[in-house]
A protein has these predicted regions:
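Conserved polymerase palm-domain catalytic core
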Residues: 1-167, 171
Length: 171
């Protein structure tokens, strides 16, 4: 998982993608982006995910308070019912935890078990690329991905998400 971490920036993600494309039999790529990711993360899921890693109820309580802090729009206070305010120190951490639980673990323990060929997942914030050796695996993943995102209150940005052919192994 790349983004918002030391030595895990966008250039590192690109290098990893290059390495995977050149050292595997990947032929199909799912290139995806989540629509308004920071605005649509569900608070209830954020807390549930945090509780998997943090046992101190005081820390969980502080995060709950942070999630409900509003944003001033002009002279009006807008209270957050979902999503995270961007540009502060904790939002990227919470976003990475959300993506780790929604996407990365699901990919690792569910998707890869169904794959017969080479595959990979590279995640950078709310953008990600999954590679597959076989077309049917990529198509199945793309279909299941949409369902997975909906379960957690998210949607793919259709204009930025697609299935591509790639690689030297395309017949």
């Amino acid at each position: 998982m790349y983004g918002f971490r030391p030595n895990r920036g966008c250039h590192d993600a690109i290098k990893e993608l290059y390495k995977r494309l050149n050292n595997t039999k990947i032929c199909y790529i799912v290139d995806a982006d989540i629509k308004g990711f920071f605005d649509h993360m569900k608070h209830e899921w954020i807390i549930r995910f945090l509780k998997l890693y943090i046992k101190d109820p005081n820390i969980i309580g502080l995060v709950k308070k942070y999630l409900k802090v509003g944003v001033m729009e002009g002279e009006e206070l807008k209270v957050n019912e979902e999503g995270l305010a961007q540009g502060n120190i904790i939002s990227p951490v919470l976003a990475n935890i959300y993506m780790h639980n929604v996407l990365t673990l699901w990919y690792k323990f569910i998707i890869t078990k169904e794959c017969k060929g080479d595959n990979f997942l590279i995640v950078y914030a709310d953008d990600f690329v999954a590679g597959f050796q076989y077309k049917w695996e990529a198509e199945n993943y793309y279909k299941l991905l949409k369902e997975r995102m909906e379960k957690f209150g998210l949607q793919l940005e259709e204009s930025k998400s697609r299935l591509l052919q790639s690689g030297a192994y395309i017949a």
